[in-house]
Regions:
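Surface-exposed short loop/turn segments
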Residues: 82-145
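Generic secondary-structure microfeatures
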Residues: 38, 44-48, 67, 75, ...
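Bacterial N-terminal signal peptides
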Residues: 9-21
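A structural "domain/chain start" motif
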Residues: 21-65, 163, 167-183
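C-terminal/domain-edge helix-coil "capping" segments
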Residues: 26-32, 122-183
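N-terminal secretory signal peptides that target proteins for export/translocation
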Residues: 1-7
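Intrinsic disorder/low-complexity segments
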Residues: 5, 12-14, 71
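N-terminal, post-signal-peptide region of Sec/Tat-exported proteins
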Residues: 54-86
Length: 183
């Protein structure tokens, strides 16, 4: 292969991988870590930072309510208290992280990430247990003129979580993830 072809292939691969959009849960079986999940504790990043406000048209409370409603509609239990969460096997929590800034064109630009963390055990020493990311999806880049539209984008990521949860807990798909598009 010539040097020019190598450079072209690298540039093309880099370009394709850097396109904004939904990045799916890894194909290496990450979705299977949702098998047997009894419920999730919900962490919305805004509750700690206060980044969102009514003036921007979006609040952390709205994101929490939207998420809880979608999860309950999908028959996924939402753990309400930290005490209950600490008693739950695997201490799973679903973390919503939205970062944004206002551009000079008066648009909001940013990223959204939805991650499940839960307790895992080290294979080489099963006495070691720690919290780790076991599932996640993200939108690398968005640009909207109204932050209310971010709720819809988060909804797409939640739908991916719900589909992966259903697939992981469906006996027909125990060993193989169905083919599907993430966008």
């Amino acid at each position: 292969m010539t040097k020019a072809k190598s450079v072209f292939r690298f540039a093309f691969a880099y370009f394709c991988c850097s396109l904004p959009g939904v990045v799916p849960a890894q194909e290496m079986g990450e979705w299977r870590t949702l098998r047997g999940l009894g419920g999730v504790y919900l962490i919305v990043e805004d509750e700690k930072t206060g980044r969102f406000n009514v003036a921007d048209g979006l609040t952390g409370d709205q994101l929490r309510q939207d998420t809880e409603e979608k999860l309950r509609s999908a028959k996924i239990s939402v753990i309400k208290t930290q005490e209950e969460w600490l008693k739950t096997s695997g201490t799973p929590y679903l973390h919503i992280n939205i970062n944004y800034y206002l551009t000079s064109a008066r648009k909001y630009s940013g990223s959204i990430e939805l991650v499940l963390e839960q307790e895992v055990v080290m294979v080489r020493d099963n006495s070691i247990k720690l919290q780790a990311r076991t599932w996640g999806v993200k939108i690398d880049e968005f640009e909207v003129d109204n932050l209310q539209k971010v709720r819809g984008e988060l909804g797409k990521l939640l739908q991916q979580f719900i589909e992966d949860y259903r697939n992981a807990n469906n006996s027909a798909s125990i060993n193989q993830r169905p083919n599907k598009s993430c966008s």
